[in-house]
């Protein structure tokens, strides 16, 4: 029994652990139901049934927006990784290394250039998995570089915001990115190019005090948390209970803070339509295929077979020739 307990059973457990992925199932934060990860991934990270919008990585977001799931990654300028030599519980450089290993990104923002329903666009995406999508020098440089490319290509600039605010490990250098990105937005306005912002869950802090709320059109995903300070901080400051749904996308739309709340499945079509309207681009031709006319049904002659019950008509009599009388004999 000792051999079975100490040797065989642990080996079986190790085999089962290796064969079962850690992210095989996802628990829906809204309904609490377990959902198969592959189903969520195939549904653009929207929980089937509850329609809860999960966080979406930068690469998956770009893949869902661009035509044929292809785009050009824009090379971003290098910045000093740790200008203040900051350290709290861990070194700032160690946190950056962990975030890069987790996401495969150099920093919190990824910029791509490609086609959106045939029209050229520049898209910048913040990834919340990279240190909470915080705004630092590298993220600020990425936004400015994306705006400069949009001005160069004369194309709309679309930004997906997802952030907890400015990156505290960079101090005033992080806060400086707020006015820098605001100046970048002004560059788009001077060039008369559309700037569309999609607010995702969550978008808070200094990001909402700068570029995230300066779009020509403000779109939000359903249920997204959007605000500057947290709800608990506001309640403690004003000493009042906040209304239900405060700082959620639907609440902000009802109070005029954003323009529309769009389901993730409809985002691509909505963004393409807005870009065409704001740039006065021609609408794509819609070819309506007319249904072919139905072929006429063949007419089949109905033949009634003769039956013995039908009366048989007698043959018609032959015509009789009219007889002329013989002439009378002449008298003597």
UniProtKB/Swiss-Prot annotation:
Keywords: ATP-binding, Cytoplasm, Fatty acid biosynthesis, Fatty acid metabolism, Lipid biosynthesis, Lipid metabolism, Nucleotide-binding, Transferase. GO terms for molecular function: acetyl-CoA carboxylase activity; ATP binding; carboxyl- or carbamoyltransferase activity. Disulfide bonds: none annotated. The keyword Lipid metabolism applies. Residues 288-332 are annotated as: Disordered. The keyword ATP-binding applies. Acetyl-CoA carboxylase is a heterohexamer composed of biotin carboxyl carrier protein (AccB), biotin carboxylase (AccC) and two subunits each of ACCase subunit alpha (AccA) and ACCase subunit beta (AccD). This is Acetyl-coenzyme A carboxylase carboxyl transferase subunit beta. It comes from Rhodopseudomonas palustris (strain BisB18). The gene is accD.
């Amino acid at each position: 029994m000792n051999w079975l307990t100490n040797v065989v059973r642990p080996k079986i457990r190790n085999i089962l652990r290796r064969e079962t992925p850690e992210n095989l199932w996802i628990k829906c934060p809204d309904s609490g139901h377990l959902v198969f990860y592959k189903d969520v991934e195939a549904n653009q990270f929207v929980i089937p049934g509850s329609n809860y919008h999960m966080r979406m990585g930068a690469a998956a977001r770009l893949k869902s927006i661009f035509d044929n799931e292809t785009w050009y990654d824009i090379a971003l300028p290098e910045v000093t990784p740790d200008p203040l030599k900051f350290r709290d519980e861990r070194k700032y450089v160690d946190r950056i290394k962990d975030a890069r290993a987790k996401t495969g990104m150099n920093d919190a923002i990824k910029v791509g250039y490609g086609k959106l329903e045939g029209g050229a666009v520049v898209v910048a995406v913040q990834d919340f998995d990279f240190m909470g999508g915080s705004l630092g020098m590298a993220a600020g440089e990425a936004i400015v570089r994306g705006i400069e490319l949009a001005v160069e290509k004369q194309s709309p600039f679309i930004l997906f915001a997802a952030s907890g605010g400015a990156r505290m490990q960079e101090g005033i250098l992080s806060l400086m990115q707020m006015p820098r990105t605001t100046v970048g937005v002004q560059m788009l306005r001077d060039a008369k190019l559309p700037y569309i912002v999609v607010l995702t869950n969550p978008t808070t802090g200094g990001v909402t005090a700068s570029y995230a709320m300066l779009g020509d059109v403000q779109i939000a995903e359903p249920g997204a948390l959007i605000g500057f300070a947290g709800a608990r901080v506001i309640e403690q400051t004003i000493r009042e209970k906040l209304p239900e749904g405060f700082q959620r996308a639907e609440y902000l739309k009802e109070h005029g803070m954003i323009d529309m709340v769009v389901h993730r499945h409809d985002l691509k079509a909505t963004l393409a339509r807005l870009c065409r309207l704001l740039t006065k681009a021609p609408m794509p031709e819609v070819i309506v295929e007319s249904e072919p006319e139905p072929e006429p049904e063949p007419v089949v002659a109905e033949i009634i077979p003769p039956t013995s019950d039908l009366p048989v008509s007698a043959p018609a009599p032959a015509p009789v020739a009219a007889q002329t009388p013989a002439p009378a004999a002449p008298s003597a």
